[in-house]
């Protein structure tokens, strides 16, 4: 239980976290990943190397300290953490490892004069409070997934039923349960967790579900990333008939019910979670505008599928913008701009807008949407990787 004295000590560390939180989390990951190899599969080494994961954790710790008096304000952050943990199957027994490494990092980075026994005790109590909150929420999701029709808990073997080349960079895998059973439904926008063995090492990754739910199979669509351990493995080494362990669908970037016109904006492989959303809009006869930005027609996946669906939906429109002028025609050439959004989005701007793509792309889209009058509460976005503050 956190005491008032604990609260005061935690708040006193906020300036230190603001100034050096990323150094602390880098040290934390260095300790944990070197001394506890059993947790390495939960972490993407590319995100470690880029600093994205340490930055995300530093931001999470800082937000927790800032809101220690009113944890209800952390709702969106807690939801993101729970969904990521569930998709990778983080378990209660792994929390003490994280806690001990975090307290050690606080002591070693801040120094014994600042990180006194009292400060460490305050952070130990705060961490336990957060761990209990997350463990309880995650157990609820695990139990719900196991109880759902076609649901399961933990890893479930799936086989690659089909492998389809979608563009020069993207390949789709159609996955069906090895046991021949049904699969649980999911909400448009959610992702699935994969458990793989690559070069003798276990790795886990999330991929958006890119086809509407059908009760029997899932589809993921993977962009080949230069140097990407898992994406290149899925492109080059996984074929029809291969077995992949999957964790149940999760994620809080989902299409919300409503009657407002819908706008879906994607950049590159960010198109994947918007496809089930577009299909849902078609099923609901909901007005929808689909905007996709790509480098060229060669890397634009699912164009024919989108064109066909839009042609069958009386209240749907679609627009494409390519950076390069090539063989495939587009509605515009260049990069995303406020002028294009203004031209293509419906008016009035009382819209629900969902956008996904590289962080810089999403930051620009968010800024432009605000300039064009879209209410902040009606903008929704998803990070592929560690969640971060979206500048824009």
Please report, for each region that a protein language model flagged, where it lies by residue.
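Ferredoxin-reductase
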Residues: 148-243, 294-296, 307, 321-325
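Globin-like tetrapyrrole-binding proteins
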Residues: 1-154
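A short, basic/flexible loop-to-alpha-helix module at the beginning of a structural domain
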Residues: 247-260
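Histidine-anchored nucleotide/phosphate-binding helix
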Residues: 271-282
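Reductase modules of NAD(P)H-dependent flavoproteins
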Residues: 17, 288-392
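Short, conserved phosphate/pyrophosphate- and ester-handling motifs at nucleotide-, phospho-/glycolipid
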Residues: 189, 270, 358
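Short, glycine-rich nucleotide/cofactor-binding loops
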Residues: 261-272
